[in-house]
């Protein structure tokens, strides 16, 4: 990865999110300077997202969300004051690893949803529930990733701008419900997954049907002008799209380099995405690589959500990539947080790339290190691990769990913490190269074995 070693990366600094959040910008640049003084390799990503062509809109959305966040705090304070016992329990439970949601937290959140709905979607068009109901699910990233290509609708249902996709689900349509996972119908495997997690059959059926109904609404829901502005220009959306672009760029460069250096066919290479969600990012990488070279590696898509994997299969078929994916629906972590043993998935195969860039920010430090060690065991010599984390010093950090209301809780970390956790997992500092996205929201770590 010689491209990271140039002198330019020693001196460059960032104006993250165009320098709008001055405090975050200063803290991130200080972090980067300090790490480089310790001979850590840190690169700043380029501003390639189309949103950067409209800096005034980025500034406007930043200010708009700051105002909304302040108003939401006042609403929340009032709710907590009236429900002190409920709030205290919710605050304790949300700090416990792998507790995704709880009744008390949901009660408070339901009060706030009315405000979020009006503020994010538009006060005259309060129908963002189809998207908000998918929070915590990888399906929401379909909306964010494809924001530039979504049609936008006005108050009376008229089309303000016609995009490639008519609804907030982007490339995903109702064909997803026809997918089978491991030969079983989607509904059946969703029910079985819940039963395996201790839910009784009647409740499992009810929850699966409710989830499918919610996804169906999501697939049919339009995008309003206000919501479009937010998902195109807010820091979090920029960060997600930049993370995808960074990961895919690293992956494509690595596979091409290995093909040339080792005289191997890219078709024979193996990539794994651990916690892949809908697989949209990985499928985009496959499509781009195949368009450029005529070849693409086999990708193992590993996730515990059957519906997300069904979405991945459906998207792969649309892009004629179904013969390049291998889907595994497995529980990723035990109840105590131990990562899935990859031997059952990989057997004696070795990986050219192990990627989990959207997962680590949900993991406690101990589980983070266990996952690193488990993935390293199955990487080829000269293989590449790609991971990442949301930055603690990122711009507009309170938006994610505030106005957006994202669940579960994200563990934002400093860039230095990322380096330390990887080093404590047995990776030499010299093997780690970090890219901080231009928005300052994420850091992507590339580790070559």
State where each predicted segment sits.
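Class I (Rossmann-like) S-adenosyl-L-methionine-dependent methyltransferase catalytic domain
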Residues: 4-97, 108-109, 140-144, 212, ...
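Class I SAM-dependent methyltransferase Rossmann-like catalytic core
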Residues: 120, 124-186, 193-200, 205-264
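Conserved class I S-adenosyl-L-methionine
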Residues: 265-279
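Local beta-strand N-terminus motif with an aromatic residue
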Residues: 268, 350-351
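Short amphipathic alpha-helix with an adjacent loop that forms part of the alpha/beta core around
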Residues: 336-348
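A conserved beta-strand element that flanks and buttresses the S-adenosyl-L-methionine
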Residues: 355
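A short His-aromatic
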Residues: 361-363
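A short glycine-rich, Lys/Arg-flanked "PGG" loop and its adjoining helix->strand segment in the class I
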Residues: 369-381
